[in-house]
Amino acid sequence: MAGVMIAAPGSGSGKTMVTCGLLTLLKRKGYNPAAFKCGPDYIDGLFHRRVLGVENGNLDSFFETGTHMRQKLSRSMERHFVVAEGVMGYFDGLGGVSVQGSSFEIGSILGLPAILVVDGRGASLSLMALIQGFLEYDAMLEGKGEEKTHDKTDCDAECAAGMQYEECRKRRWKENEENYREKKSHTSNGLHGCVCGNTDCHESKGKKNNNIRGIFFNRMSPMIYNRIKPMVEELFRIPVIGYLPELNFLHVGSRHLGLVLPDEIDGIREQLEQLADRMDENLEWEPLLKIAAEAGGRDREVPVREEAGAGQQTGNVAGIKPGNKLGNEPGNILHFRLGIARDEAFCFYYEDNLRAMEQAGARLVYFSLLHQEKLPDGLDGLILGGGYPENHGEALAANRTMRDSVAAAAATGMPILAECGGYLYLLDSLEGADGTVYPMAGVLKGHGYRAGKTGRFGYITLGPNRCLPYLREGEEIKGHEFHYWDCDCGEDEFCMTAAKPKGGRSWPCMRTAKQVMAGFPHLYYPSCPGLVRRFAGQCVEYGQRHDRKHDRQERNGQEHDGEEHEL
């Protein structure tokens, strides 16, 4: 078992490029790497999967239970050297003032050691203060997010006698802070206690190891690196495992949803090979492999919040047995052909969502709304994911036969789930990135337009306002919103309510028409197994109504049909 997390003090520090360079190098050296992205991001995963050709997925402590994340990581580490790319700054979580959902929390839950990528551009000795702050804050949190479930076994007699959790948390936080401020002529290294080496020293007693196990400098000159590396290692007793200088050949731009897509960067594969060459020159393998070997061994069994992945069961991705609720016994899987739109315009999918559908009997059929004239024959359902349809408005509008094919399928009652960009495609019209208004599929009334800002952004929990085709009143499903386009439909057309986990803000969202459910939120299907079961069941029923068998009683594993279009 081997794995590391690539984390950083903030976005823009070089996490994605360091991750991609390391994955390229690991693959080159025969380590069979796999990649995970912490949090709800899709685009970084596209770099991992499309450009590098490595398995990838997401680790998300808001969407998933700790048990499910551990199982997923453990399965991957049985066959791969795992590299998990962090999200935003290492401690940044929900609401901007919590570690919930942060890289730190995910690493604490999984016992996954972190390599902190520190951007050295325009700084030198000041980086020492930054590193010390991260190490000490990491240790002060003691592997417990400040809003985790209260466990009285961790508390003293006074607390066990009845101290309220909030009061207990504040007191323990204050004690930890005071302990770290009390130096008494000793220097804390934030990792192994005091540099004096005395294990009985007040700085060493009771201190737990950091998740941060190594430092990697980005955009640093060789001269500064050779001077600062021994200073960091001597003062903080933490290995500095390498650096990258400023790389003028590597240029990865960004747009409103993050990094540009891999296919939009000329020569990206060649650039990453050059990046791997430079990492090979400046990366210290022995300490990296030693750190990676600790993965899983430091699992602290952090209590997982009840709301983290609530409703999701464990054992398989969707928390369901194949064939559940479909009128057949497990093992006799009723297959259905599920069309997945995947091309340059529609490419945002959680791999866990696709696996959940496969476990429910789906045989995935990838197709392109841009390049194919019509839907593949014999589909029983559709999922239209997010992406950048606004950048391809002219081509989507010109493909009239595909728009008509999707509209006809919806009119016959085909089960369809559409998210964000997929939702925009189902509208009457869409304002493209060039300002031109283009006709779309016309399945749902409304016009998609550039809003100019992210009016709704971040994690959400959604609940239906009435019984819906795939959801029942009282059920909840988790999701994420991030979009600069909006729709001019009225609020009375929405069928669900989205609520932020912090701050209490909520808003109406999602629309239905026949068996179509669509909206801006990207849903995490495994957080609501009922949605997966009902959608799968209705896909099977749709195929039966249209007298299609697709060898539904096959006992063999599901296979992928169709081609996945290169991005």
Feature roles, as predicted:
Residues 5, 83-85, 115, 216, ...:
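Structural motif
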Residues 336-400, 404-409:
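Phosphate-binding active sites in nucleotide-utilizing proteins
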Residues 139-210, 296-334, 540-567:
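Intrinsically disordered, low-complexity terminal tails and inter-domain linkers enriched
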Residues 2-17, 23-110, 118-144, 192, ...:
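ATP-dependent carboxylate-amine ligase catalytic core
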Residues 389-468:
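Cysteine-nucleophile active-site neighborhood
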Residues 125-150, 172, 176, 194-197, ...:
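Internal gly/pro-rich beta-alpha loop/helix module
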Residues 229, 233, 247-305, 325, ...:
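Amide-donor transfer/coupling interface in amidating biosynthetic enzymes
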Residues 112, 238, 411-415:
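A short helix->loop->beta-strand "cap" motif at the edges of active sites that frequently abuts
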